[in-house]
Amino acid sequence: MNILGIYGAIGWDGNIPYIVERMGNFWVHGSGATLIMNGKLKNAINEERFSRIKYDGTYPKLSIQHILDYNKLTNSDIDLVVYVCSSTEINFALKQSTYIEKKLQEYFPNCKVEFLAHHLAHSAATFYTSGFKEANILSFDGAGDYEHPSEDSGKWLTPHFKFSIGQDTLSQDNKICEVHTEFCGNAPMHNSFGNLYDICSLKTYNIKTKNVKDDHYVEQSEQHSYPGKIMGLAAFGDYQKVNLPEWFSLEKWENEFPQLQSNNADYSIMFARFNPDDLAAWMQHQFEKYLLLFLSNIPKKLKRDNLCLGGGCALNILANSKIIEQGI
């Protein structure tokens, strides 16, 4: 059986000005394709490797064609296409209208189409490549897919992280069981680890580079480079020199997990008073502080010996090292 995994915009270019203007950073980025043949992973490629466009989010036609050619396959040889939908409103609408499913079946005439949730894709990627038989899994980033309407507002909710348990058993069912979800509601989603780091990185980067004439990272699509650069800048600052409201407050315990609520501070105004190096250090400290708080309070009945991290926030190697140091 040939299974093709796809992530990327279908039916639009992934970066329509209307979407950028209305939704800010909610554009499709990092598209790519993966092939599994008879249960074995054969290829996994990002579109930007071929297009040479950083964070390319368009339909990954070059990646797909390379995979097909490499394995001597045609579009008709694909039995199943698994599509990971994004959290943009337009992709959500296209999925709901069955446009995406019909388009994929047009591209791959003999395939069935299934949709895979954003955070489940992250969770599977980290767990199934870990070698662990059993593990806690935390997938966390700015936001995931739209999931279901809020009882209060009727608006569709997006999770900014999911906590799961992975178990590699002989059974094919329930290998990854989601046990806790934190929803960030709708934009601007300030109670999201990833979104807060992203917003604060943008403010800090702009302060740091305001007098730099040749700034190579000014385009909308390049702003996803900011968090990594600010993480590196943190080593040069002192978080204790920054007196700002905490990112989160611990409002209550829900399902025996700490529930973190954003303080909704307007950091865009407050940041201007501080050195950007110190701001970077403060941001990193806040990220580590509340991530470690959450991971340290996993209920005992759910706690496993191993931990897998997935999603954009899992790229924060400084926080990852703290997790290892504290034996979480």
Q: Can you name each region flagged by the protein language model?
A:
Residues 1-328:
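Short acidic/glycine-rich loops and adjacent helix/strand connectors
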